[in-house]
């Protein structure tokens, strides 16, 4: 009898502790291109607050659909406005918490040891000739933000028709980066921040402003979030400390930092 009583008491203590534990944790679903910078920012947040952050990185399209299917996330950071709009339209995020946090740039990369040096990217840019018999690594142009930006730029510059069949499409921008880093493709189109963290690639050209929509990373708390710490986390992302971290990795900080 006493054994059963102690077992029941132990279970009650575990259940009572569960909400408290949840208060000390935040689950973040973030675009793959944010990994290095956000990992560092999250570590600083945890050190300052004691709140554990668990981050999952993937294509924004995949993350939005996972949240829609019930995946437990407190914060969503997309690499474009469309997938955050999708989340808002499906009532997956709290609109009053949404802000455009970061910006980025689109660049052309090659393996570090490639003979290709610099390329002037502009109207009439012949990317197909540059690739030769090789392929061009990009994220999925139909769904993944980095791929959609790449397609928009290539269409604007008149290069899309010549390269569409030569694209090696990847599940996210970091996978496209890896194709070039491993030498599997001679060229790739990624964000400038991705190129900066991979020593096996180099930037050979930058796509001109106006050839693709501004790369924007909106952030919002999810509708189903039950973490009281989520609001503190969102506030931290707007802080001078977070701004310094993101800018160190090459992101543009789009909002005024809040101390």
Segments from the language model and where they lie:
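Bacterial N-terminal signal peptides
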Residues: 4-17
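Sec/Tat signal peptide C-region and signal peptidase I cleavage site
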Residues: 18-22
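Exported/periplasmic ABC-transporter solute-binding proteins
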Residues: 23-71, 78-81, 85-259
